[in-house]
Design a protein with these regions (language model features):
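N-terminal secretory signal peptides
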Residues: 1-40, 50, 54-56
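Iron-sulfur (Fe-S) cluster-binding modules
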Residues: 49, 61
Length: 244
């Protein structure tokens, strides 16, 4: 499934910037403050449980704690989840839903010919891309557990594997001044994503879910997985990324 290839948006080896409240303090007080912040950071990094029947990588823990999400316990009622905003939910304790229980809306019967299929990356890039699915699956992969909510209808907590947008943008070499990505799919469906803050989200183009090839009704060959956004923005049958 490529679980060992966890290259999601935050780059590996990223340096975490600790609290700077010690500026202007004495050397002894500075040392105590640095110790306190490191200890508290480590407390946040350990003890993350793995739930469900699949071992998935959680990627790099975000250093932005300003907007705390609500941590939900294992077994939290689905009838309550479907009324919630995914941007407010910490889903790390929730079970992985069996794939045969996944709900879906929108187009479900579009057939893609892999012989001619290409994912294009165009717009403000130095190196436009036109990639087959085989070429895409050979790029560094990432596996992430992300919650999909169709408000009032269904909720899917899935383990998604694919290529991160960051990886694709590195291949295409985004030009200075670029601000947005337009993710396009079948039936002219488009979702716009700001480049600012892209590295702090779990965002990828998935070709597998719960260790299985992404089925046609869920957007094969590529589906946008977009943390903190409702399922209506998770474009299916993705075939183009336009940088603007």
């Amino acid at each position: 499934m490529g679980i060992h290839h966890d290259h999601l948006l935050p780059t590996p080896g990223r340096v975490v910037k600790f609290c700077t409240e010690s500026e202007g303090k004495s050397p002894r007080k500075k040392a105590r403050l640095r110790m306190w912040t490191r200890r508290n950071f480590l407390k946040r990094c350990v003890g993350i449980p793995l739930s469900g029947f699949i071992l998935c990588s959680w990627g790099v823990i975000s250093t932005s704690w300003a907007k705390a999400k609500k941590s939900l316990p294992q077994g939290f009622p689905k009838e309550q989840l479907i009324q919630m905003n995914p941007a407010d939910i910490d889903n790390r304790n929730l079970e992985i839903d069996p794939f045969d229980k996944f709900g879906t809306t929108g187009a479900t019967d579009i057939t893609i010919d892999l012989k001619t299929y290409r994912l294009k990356v165009t717009g403000k890039v130095d190196q436009p891309l036109s990639l087959s699915l085989d070429q895409i699956t050979k790029l560094p992969s990432t596996t992430q557990i992300v919650l999909l909510i169709c408000p009032g209808v269904f909720v899917n907590n899935g383990c998604w594997t694919g290529v991160s947008l960051k990886t694709l943008l590195q291949e295409a070499r985004t030009k200075t001044g670029a601000q947005f990505l337009d993710i396009k799919g079948a039936q002219e469906k488009v979702t716009r994503i700001p480049l600012k803050g892209l590295q702090e989200k779990k965002i990828l183009l998935a070709y597998r879910v719960n260790e299985a090839t992404l089925p046609r009704k869920h957007g094969f060959p590529l589906r946008l997985v977009l943390e903190d956004h409702y399922g209506s923005e998770w474009v299916k049958y993705v075939d183009e990324i336009v940088v603007s």
